[in-house]
A protein has these predicted regions:
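Hydrophobic helical membrane-anchoring modules
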Residues: 1-20, 33, 157, 181-240
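Cell-envelope/extracellular polymer assembly enzymes that use nucleotide-activated donors
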Residues: 21-23, 51
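Active-site beta-to-alpha loop of glycosyltransferases that engages the nucleotide-sugar donor
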Residues: 26-40, 61
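Short, acidic, metal-binding catalytic loop of nucleotide-sugar glycosyltransferases
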Residues: 40-49
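A conserved acidic beta->alpha catalytic loop
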Residues: 56-63
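Acceptor/aglycone-binding surface of glycosyltransferases and processive sugar-polymer synthases
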Residues: 76-90, 108-184, 210-221, 226-231
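Short aromatic/hydrophobic "clamp" motif used to bind/position activated sugar donors
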Residues: 97
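The conserved acidic donor/metal-binding loop of glycosyltransferases
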Residues: 101-106
Length: 240
C-alpha cells in the first residue's frame, strides 16, 4: 500500500513519499514580518513532519524567528537570491526538496498536491502563479513574468507558463545531478535545465498572495538579469 501526502494509504501497491521525506527550503533575507507565518503554515500542513531549511543573510530577527519555529538555519553572507537558494536545495538530504519564498506569497496548503504529483512520477512540480491571473502581483512584475514565460517557450521549444515561480518540488536526484550556475535568474534555471534534460516536469496552478514586507529585487535590473539567464541557460541546454 502506498501513502498519500497526508501519510494515508492508497491502493496502487507501491510505497510513496510522505512528508517525512520532504525538506522545505528557502533563502531568507530580512523577512521578519512574514517568515513566522510561512513556517507556521508549513508546520500545520505537514503536521510538523517536513524538515525546514533556511539559508539566511539577514540583519534583522529573521534567523531567530526561523529557529523558534524549528527550522535549520544556515547563515550565509548576502550574495544574492540564487546563491542562497542553491545552498538551500543542496543542504538537506531528504528525497524530496520543496522550494518556497519567505514572504507569505505562496500557498503552503498546496504542498500535499505537490507531493502527490511527485508520487505519481513527476521529477519536478512547478507552481504556476499566472494561471489564476496573479492579481496580487504588481502589474509590472506580472507583465514581466508573462514576457519571461514567452521568451523561455520560444527558446526551449516547450510551452512554459511561469519561469520565475519560487514554489516547486523536486526529486533529490534532479537538484544533485545538475550544476546550477545562475544567481538572480536561478528560479528560471531551476525549471529550464530539468525540462530540457528530459526530466518529467509539470506546471500546476497555484494561488498567489500579496507579499508581506518590502521586495528586495529591483524590477528593471532584476528583470534584465532574469531574461539574460533564460537566454543563456536555454541555449546552453539546447546545444549541450
Amino acid at each position: 500500500m502506498s501513502r498519500n501526502a497526508d501519510g494515508d494509504s492508497s491502493a496502487d501497491g507501491s510505497d510513496g513519499f510522505t512528508f517525512d521525506d520532504v525538506s522545505v527550503v528557502m533563502g531568507t533575507y530580512n523577512e521578519a514580518e512574514a517568515v513566522g507565518t510561512v513556517l507556521s503554515d508549513v508546520d500545520e500542513v505537514t503536521d510538523g513532519r517536513a524538515e525546514v531549511v533556511c539559508v539566511d543573510g539577514s540583519s534583522d530577527e529573521t534567523p531567530g524567528i526561523a529557529r523558534d519555529h524549528g527550522a535549520t538555519v544556515v547563515r550565509q553572507a548576502p550574495q544574492g537570491y540564487g546563491v542562497a537558494v542553491r545552498e538551500a536545495i543542496l543542504t538537506p538530504d531528504r528525497p524530496v526538496v520543496v522550494t518556497t519564498d519567505c514572504d507569505d506569497t505562496y500557498p503552503m496548503e498546496q504542498l500535499p498536491e505537490f507531493l502527490d504529483l511527485v508520487n505519481e512520477g513527476y521529477d519536478v512540480v512547478s507552481g504556476d502563479r499566472l494561471y489564476h491571473g496573479a492579481d496580487a502581483m504588481p502589474g509590472l512584475n506580472r507583465q514581466g513574468n508573462r514576457a519571461f514565460a514567452l521568451l523561455a517557450s520560444v527558446l526551449t521549444g516547450r510551452r512554459v507558463h511561469d519561469t520565475t515561480t519560487g514554489m516547486r518540488a523536486y526529486r533529490r536526484d534532479v537538484v544533485e545531478d545538475i550544476e546550477w550556475t545562475e544567481n538572480t535568474g536561478l528560479s528560471a534555471e531551476l525549471l529550464i535545465r530539468p525540462l530540457l534534460r528530459g526530466y518529467d516536469v509539470i506546471e500546476v496552478p497555484i494561488a498567489y498572495r500579496e507579499r508581506r514586507g518590502r521586495t528586495k529585487l529591483d524590477p528593471f535590473a532584476g528583470g534584465a538579469a532574469i531574461a539574460k539567464s533564460i537566454a543563456k541557460v536555454s541555449l546552453e541546454e539546447r546545444f549541450r
